[in-house]
C-alpha cells in the first residue's frame, strides 16, 4: 500500500521510521511519503493561511497550496483523499478494515481553524477521532494510519497477531501474561501453563467475552454468539 501524507509538519511522522511500520517500509510492504503543503504555495512569503472572510478568530488554510499538493500526490497515488476533520465519520476498526483493502490512500492534515470550504470537492472521505479538539490533523492521522497499516498482510508477520487484538472481531482482547509465573502473589492462570492449545483457545475466548461484557457492554450487545460461545459460557456457569 502507498500512503501519502499532506501536512505542514512532515517531521511529526518520523514515528513511522521505527518499530513495526518502520520494518514494513524497509521490506517494501508499505510505501509512505510526506508532502509539505508549504512547498506548494505560490505566495512569495510561503504563507498557506489567511484571515477568514466575514471575520472571526484564527486563520484558515488557503485552497491553492492544498489542492496543488493533492494533485501532485495523485500523480503517483490513485487512492482516496482522506481528510482528518470534525465532520467525518468516527474512526473505528471496521473503517480501518475497509481502508486497508485500498492500494493507496492520501491523508490531508488540516491546521489552524480549518481548511477553505472549496477544498472539500477534492476530498473523498472525512474521518474524525471523536468529539474533541486537537491542535492539528497530524495528531489524528498518526493513529489512523497506524491502525490501517497493521492490517496489511505481512506488516505484523502473522495474521493471527491482529485477528486476536481488541476490536478486530468485535470483542476486547483476552488477558495477557508473561514471566514470572508469580508476581507479588498474583499467579498466571494454570491453564496457560498447561500446553493444551485447544483448552487455552477456549479459555481466551471465554475471557474475551467476559471482559467485553463487563467493560464494554455496548460492544457485547452487538455481537452474535456462536454455538461454541454459548457452549463455552454454559460450561463456565456449570462449574
Swiss-Prot record:
<dbReference type="InterPro" id="IPR002649">
    <property type="entry name" value="tRNA_m1G_MeTrfase_TrmD"/>
</dbReference>
<keyword id="KW-0819">tRNA processing</keyword>
<dbReference type="GO" id="GO:0005829">
    <property type="term" value="C:cytosol"/>
</dbReference>
<feature type="binding site">
    <location>
        <begin position="129"/>
        <end position="134"/>
    </location>
    <ligand>
        <name>S-adenosyl-L-methionine</name>
    </ligand>
</feature>
<dbReference type="Pfam" id="PF01746">
    <property type="entry name" value="tRNA_m1G_MT"/>
</dbReference>
<comment type="similarity">
    <text>Belongs to the RNA methyltransferase TrmD family.</text>
</comment>
<dbReference type="InterPro" id="IPR029026">
    <property type="entry name" value="tRNA_m1G_MTases_N"/>
</dbReference>
<keyword id="KW-0808">Transferase</keyword>
<keyword id="KW-0963">Cytoplasm</keyword>
<dbReference type="InterPro" id="IPR016009">
    <property type="entry name" value="tRNA_MeTrfase_TRMD/TRM10"/>
</dbReference>
<feature type="binding site">
    <location>
        <position position="110"/>
    </location>
    <ligand>
        <name>S-adenosyl-L-methionine</name>
    </ligand>
</feature>
<keyword id="KW-0949">S-adenosyl-L-methionine</keyword>
<dbReference type="InterPro" id="IPR023148">
    <property type="entry name" value="tRNA_m1G_MeTrfase_C_sf"/>
</dbReference>
<protein>
    <recommendedName>
        <fullName>tRNA (guanine-N(1)-)-methyltransferase</fullName>
        <ecNumber>2.1.1.228</ecNumber>
    </recommendedName>
</protein>
<comment type="function">
    <text>Specifically methylates guanosine-37 in various tRNAs.</text>
</comment>
<dbReference type="InterPro" id="IPR029028">
    <property type="entry name" value="Alpha/beta_knot_MTases"/>
</dbReference>
<keyword id="KW-0489">Methyltransferase</keyword>
<dbReference type="GO" id="GO:0002939">
    <property type="term" value="P:tRNA N1-guanine methylation"/>
</dbReference>
<comment type="subunit">
    <text>Homodimer.</text>
</comment>
<dbReference type="GO" id="GO:0052906">
    <property type="term" value="F:tRNA (guanine(37)-N1)-methyltransferase activity"/>
</dbReference>
